[in-house]
Amino acid sequence: MAGAAGPEIERLIQLLARLPGLGPRSARRAALHLIKKRDALMAPLASALQVAIDKIEVCSTCGNIDSQNPCTVCTDPRRDSSIIVVVADVADLWALERASATNGRYHVLGATLSPLDGVGPEDLTIDALVKRAHDPGVAEIILALNATVDGQTTAHYVTDLLQDANVKVTRLAHGVPVGGELDYLDEGTLSAAMRQRTLF
């Protein structure tokens, strides 16, 4: 019903609806929840958003987002600087960090190549990656890109550009997840798992 909420509340709902995973109904529910919890949730959220606006920046080395530049990953002396893990997005970097999957450093491309979406090499930070790969201390580039058509296209493109760098280029293995049942896996995953089988 139009006019049920004032313009300020409607603006809040419209902005919340822009967030991934929130449609108009979910945004309306979220707005109502925030308003009901004004002191306990809305005020701290507004404060945290303002701090993020003021303090968060993109790392000029790897593309991570942090409150310092270079980021805490790039400046951590315990990290193995001979390894660069290439990811499409900061969310992928965070997922690898949560899993403690690597002790290397990162490079965030910003996306994957996607001609259908109009994303070309010039839209990614591939040139910066190639430059980093030529640093004398770098020994391995790990392509931690999604096993999608766009991810694989990006991996092949990057690999071709790194041919003259004196680095080993590897990619994540693909296949059966831990706890996965064969009957529930798609054909592409099963085929990749069979091709990349290892000694037991």
Swiss-Prot record:
Q: Which sequence ranges does the entry mark as zinc finger (C4-type)?
A: 59-74
Q: Which InterPro entries match?
A: DNA_Rcmb_RecR, Rcmb_RecR, Rcmb_RecR_Znf, TOPRIM_dom, TOPRIM_RecR
Q: Which terms under GO biological process does the entry name?
A: DNA recombination; DNA repair
Q: Which UniProt keyword terms apply here?
A: DNA damage, DNA recombination, DNA repair, Metal-binding, Zinc, Zinc-finger
Q: Which residues form the Toprim domain?
A: 82-177
Give one GO term, molecular function aspect. DNA binding
Q: Does the keyword Metal-binding apply?
A: yes
Query: Looking at the record's lineage, which domain of life comes first?
Result: Bacteria
Q: Known SUPFAM superfamilies for this protein?
A: Recombination protein RecR
Q: Does the keyword Plastid apply?
A: no
Q: Known PANTHER family for this protein?
A: RECOMBINATION PROTEIN RECR (PTHR30446:SF0)
According to its UniProt entry, the function of this protein is described as: May play a role in DNA repair. It seems to be involved in an RecBC-independent recombinational process of DNA repair. It may act with RecF and RecO.
Q: Which family does it belong to?
A: Belongs to the RecR family.
The molecule here is called: Recombination protein RecR
Species this chain originates from: Rhodopseudomonas palustris (strain TIE-1)
Query: Lineage, please?
Result: Bacteria, Pseudomonadati, Pseudomonadota, Alphaproteobacteria, Hyphomicrobiales
